[in-house]
Amino acid sequence: MYKRQVYSEAVGDALAYVVKARVQLLRDLGASNSADSAFSLIQGIETLSLRLERHVQNAQEIAEWLDARDDVAAVWYAGLPTSPWYAAANRYAPRGVGAVLSFELKGGVDAGRALVDSLQLFSHLANIGDVRSLVIHPASTTHSQLTPEEQLTTGVTPGLVRLSVGLENVDDLRSDLAAGFAAARAVTEAGLRAS
């Protein structure tokens, strides 16, 4: 107790001045955005609900389209009535379940790689949540260092493709994916002819 009293008596007013100066400078100059950053932040927040509606709508349409295709073995998207998570999704996310979905492409690793490589609108990235549509084939990219057995243990199958559906026109996205499926089919057929 004595040391604290001596310190405050010795520093006293000077310490108060340092605290006041620091608080005042922080208030006057401190951690604030630049005008451009603040404008961008406001614009982003004001349009967020519209963008999310478009993400969800596009993802739902793409999932339904994929689910109807013969070259797709399965689609994992909680917004589909066939999904085991459909009831929970409707209960917890009644306005839509998001824009990320996965599907199992028939034809394996080579078909998955061919599909991703041939896409023009979808960017080949491991991210999610961008305004642009993104695609990745985990077996040939993010999980390629694992053995096939280890990949299966982590849930990565040879034909697994993950999409993060963006804001583009959904007809353009379907056309891009259709071209990707054609490339995957060509690789699969070439492999069958070779064997």
Residue ranges and their predicted role:
Residues 3-100, 104-116, 121-132:
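Active-site C-terminal subdomain of aminotransferase-like
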Residues 51, 117-118, 133-195:
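PLP-dependent enzyme catalytic core of the Aspartate aminotransferase-like
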